[in-house]
Each structure stands twice: as structure tokens, then as C-alpha cells.
């Protein structure tokens, strides 16, 4: 064995052998050189010395016939070692999941369904908006009609409470008059009475007295007379006015036939009372200085079947 190894060393370059071995394997060069120098490595006999067959370290034995290295091979022709690595475990390549090819018909059906749903939602929203608008318009129309029917009574109540437009104010209790302070210089006020009717009413309507003089704070009772000249009963209601208009604030009616509807039968004549008082505060109003005449006028209107008033 030693001769064969020596012949091998003579035919090859020792340094090239060692360098090739060290670059291709993990064996320390110093250890391998020491083994060669000390002739502790024995080579196997032919046919392993053939130039075409690699020499495995499994075939290199020491003198005790023990395996030295098991993972390194070298070739005699190329004089270099090659590392024999174990066969790597192949990594399984994931099989791509086939992407399902979308069906054009299904896509078209889905698009059509989405478009139909969107159109239906838009229709519902538009219908709700139209319903809301219609409800608001209906409420507005009802409110306008209600105000038109209630305009005359509301105007009368407003004028009666504020004295606007010469309308007299009502007194709820006769005791209010007694509480007025009459400790002031007073002078008589002349009150003129006037009556009128619409052209359509076949009534004769006039005051029983044309004028009257009274002191501010003094209750005054007067009458108006009305006669129905037809063969059928007629129901009417009267409105009143005061001139000058600024005197209406101080003209308070305690009782008046104009508060209620008046029914007069065929060819019937009735007397209708008016109880009023002129407030003494009129004497303290600078705007009323020089005012000594006040006119109280009434006009009758017809009450129709619907409870509304129309001029007659």
C-alpha cells in the first residue's frame, strides 16, 4: 500500500492535490498533510486507480482498516476532491388553483339585476318624495281655506279686543265701569247712531234715536229697530264701526245685538238693545282733545246655510 501511495504522489502534484481537496471539502488541510506524511492513509488496490472511476474516501482506510471520511470524493485525472452532498428533498411545487372562468351570461344577468334593483330603489325614493310634497301642498290648501272661512270672525274678535279700525271694545262686567277714576274734568260726548243694510236684504233697519249725549264713564242704553218685509224668516248678523277710528279704543259695548245672529220672522219687527259706555280715559288722551262727537254705525249681513256670513 505504501508503494502505491508513493507512486501516486510521484505522478501528481502534492500541493495541487491538497489545495483541491481543501477547497472542495470541509477537511482541515493540516490534518490531511500530517496523515500523508506519517503514511497513515492507505489507498485501495486497482481497479479503483482507474482514471475513469472516482476514488471515494469510503475506500481510503487507515492501517486499522477504519473508515476515514464518508462524504468526499476525488478524481485521479482532475486531482480534485468533490463534495458529495446528500440528495436534497425536492420542494413540492404548489399546484395553482385554476381560476374559474366567469360566465358572460351570469355576469350580464347580475348586471341587469343590479340595474333593476337600483331603478326600483330610485322609484321608491321618488314616490316617497312625491307623497311628502303632496301632503305639504294639501295641508297648505286646507290651511288657506280654513283661514279664508275664519277671516271675518277672527277680524271681528281682533277689532273688538284692540279697538282697531274704530271697533269698540267689549266689557265683561259692569263693575269695571265703577272702578274708573272719575276725579277729572268731564264734558258730554255726543253719540250719533247710524244703520244700513245690504241691497239684497228686504229689511227695514234704523235706530230708534238719532243722537244722544252722555258723560264718559256713564252707561248708555239705546235701541235699533228691524222689520222683515218678506214672507219667509231671515237670519242676519250685524257688524259695527266707530268714527273717528281713534275713539273706538274708548268705546266699550257691554251688551249688543251684534254679538249674536238675529232671526226675524215674516213681517216681524223687533227692537234690539245696545248698552255701551265711553271710557273716561278718553279725556286724558291728547289725541282725543277736541273730539266731542262719536258715530256708532251698524250694517247687517246675511247668515247662509253653511254658517258663513254674506252681505245682504
UniProtKB/Swiss-Prot annotation:
<keyword id="KW-0496">Mitochondrion</keyword>
<keyword id="KW-0809">Transit peptide</keyword>
<comment type="function">
    <text>Exerts its effect at some terminal stage of cytochrome c oxidase synthesis, probably by being involved in the insertion of the copper B into subunit I.</text>
</comment>
<keyword id="KW-1133">Transmembrane helix</keyword>
<dbReference type="GO" id="GO:0005739">
    <property type="term" value="C:mitochondrion"/>
</dbReference>
<dbReference type="Pfam" id="PF04442">
    <property type="entry name" value="CtaG_Cox11"/>
</dbReference>
<feature type="transmembrane region" description="Helical">
    <location>
        <begin position="132"/>
        <end position="152"/>
    </location>
</feature>
<comment type="similarity">
    <text>Belongs to the COX11/CtaG family.</text>
</comment>
<feature type="compositionally biased region" description="Pro residues">
    <location>
        <begin position="87"/>
        <end position="101"/>
    </location>
</feature>
<dbReference type="InterPro" id="IPR023471">
    <property type="entry name" value="CtaG/Cox11_dom_sf"/>
</dbReference>
<dbReference type="GO" id="GO:0065003">
    <property type="term" value="P:protein-containing complex assembly"/>
</dbReference>
<feature type="topological domain" description="Mitochondrial intermembrane">
    <location>
        <begin position="153"/>
        <end position="312"/>
    </location>
</feature>
<feature type="region of interest" description="Disordered">
    <location>
        <begin position="79"/>
        <end position="117"/>
    </location>
</feature>
<dbReference type="GO" id="GO:0009060">
    <property type="term" value="P:aerobic respiration"/>
</dbReference>
<dbReference type="GO" id="GO:0005507">
    <property type="term" value="F:copper ion binding"/>
</dbReference>
<dbReference type="GO" id="GO:0005743">
    <property type="term" value="C:mitochondrial inner membrane"/>
</dbReference>
<keyword id="KW-0472">Membrane</keyword>
<keyword id="KW-0186">Copper</keyword>
<protein>
    <recommendedName>
        <fullName>Cytochrome c oxidase assembly protein COX11, mitochondrial</fullName>
    </recommendedName>
</protein>
<dbReference type="InterPro" id="IPR007533">
    <property type="entry name" value="Cyt_c_oxidase_assmbl_CtaG"/>
</dbReference>
<keyword id="KW-0999">Mitochondrion inner membrane</keyword>
<keyword id="KW-0812">Transmembrane</keyword>
<feature type="compositionally biased region" description="Low complexity">
    <location>
        <begin position="102"/>
        <end position="117"/>
    </location>
</feature>
Amino acid at each position: 500500500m505504501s508503494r502505491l501511495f508513493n507512486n501516486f504522489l510521484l505522478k501528481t502534484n502534492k500541493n495541487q492535490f491538497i489545495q483541491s481537496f481543501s477547497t472542495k471539502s470541509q477537511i482541515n488541510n493540516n490534518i490531511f498533510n500530517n496523515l500523508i506524511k506519517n503514511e497513515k492513509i492507505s489507498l485501495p488496490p486497482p481497479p479503483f486507480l482507474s482514471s475513469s472511476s472516482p476514488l471515494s474516501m469510503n475506500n481510503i482506510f487507515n492501517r486499522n482498516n477504519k473508515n476515514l471520511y464518508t462524504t468526499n470524493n476525488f478524481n485521479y485525472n482532475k486531482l480534485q476532491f468533490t463534495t458529495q452532498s446528500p440528495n436534497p428533498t425536492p420542494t413540492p411545487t404548489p399546484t395553482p388553483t385554476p381560476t374559474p372562468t366567469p360566465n358572460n351570461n351570469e355576469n350580464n344577468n347580475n348586471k341587469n339585476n343590479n340595474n333593476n334593483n337600483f331603478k326600483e330603489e330610485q322609484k321608491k325614493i321618488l314616490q316617497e318624495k312625491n307623497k311628502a310634497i303632496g301632503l305639504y301642498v294639501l295641508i297648505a290648501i286646507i290651511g288657506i281655506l280654513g283661514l279664508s272661512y275664519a277671516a271675518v270672525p277672527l277680524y271681528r274678535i281682533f277689532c273688538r279686543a284692540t279697538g282697531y279700525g274704530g271697533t269698540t271694545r267689549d266689557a265683561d262686567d259692569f263693575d269695571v265701569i265703577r272702578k274708573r277714576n272719575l276725579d277729572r274734568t268731564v264734558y258730554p260726548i255726543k253719540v250719533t247712531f247710524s244703520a244700513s243694510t245690504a241691497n239684497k236684504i228686504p229689511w227695514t233697519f234704523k235706530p230708534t234715536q238719532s243722537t244722544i249725549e252722555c258723560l264718559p264713564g256713564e252707561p248708555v242704553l239705546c235701541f235699533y229697530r228691524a222689520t222683515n218685509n218678506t214672507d219667509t224668516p231671515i237670519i242676519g248678523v250685524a257688524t259695527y264701526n266707530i268714527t273717528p277710528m281713534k275713539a273706538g279704543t274708548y268705546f266699550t259695548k257691554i251688551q249688543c245685538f251684534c254679538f249674536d245672529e238675529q232671526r226675524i220672522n215674516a213681517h216681524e219687527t223687533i227692537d234690539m238693545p245696545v248698552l255701551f259706555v265711553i271710557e273716561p280715559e278718553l279725556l286724558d288722551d291728547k289725541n282725543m282733545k277736541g273730539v266731542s262727537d262719536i258715530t256708532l254705525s251698524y250694517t247687517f249681513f246675511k247668515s247662509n246655510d253653511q254658517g258663513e256670513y254674506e252681505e245682504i
